[in-house]
Amino acid sequence: MRVAFGGPLFRKKMEHLVKVKDYIPDIRVDLKYASEDNFTGHKIYDFTEAYLRYGTVQKLMKVQEALRKQGLSLKIWDAYRPPSAQFVFWEICPDDTYIANPIKGFSPHSRGGAVDITLVDRTGKELEMPTEYDDFSGKAVRDYPGWTPQAAANQRIVEQLMVDNGFVAYEGEWWHYVDTDKYEVVEEAEVLK
């Protein structure tokens, strides 16, 4: 039996939630919400691995490959986010500029199609970027004029590669990218079984 590229079986595979490191072993992962090192000050996740949709990981692989040639790498700060975490975030910071209101609809993170990233060198050292992660100020906005030239250049490297490979850059957070393919919300129990 032959399956046409883009047919229903192909689409099903692209929708699977997978562990990112199984496909991109050299990518760095530091899930901020799996520790207390985040804007809440609390550990939110019960897992430390980054999960994304298979189709999203395929796009991220191309970005990582291009960075690898430059002696650089992506570092993931957040990927799949359980819907329950979205409610916790909203309770702490009920501002839809920064946090998707779970009553109105879940973040693309809860669909496995969004990733928060930064740039590191081959040793894993973070390069200068515009702000710290989860900086809820105007300095994190993509067109903020006060970034240092080096931070702006590093951010542009990531943004150009991400956009060229099928992601949309969120204007309010320089680190946040959403896959152009749309997915349904994934319940935590479906991921961590």
Task: Explain the meaning of each model-derived region.
Residues P82:
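Segments that shape or occlude catalytic/ligand-binding pockets
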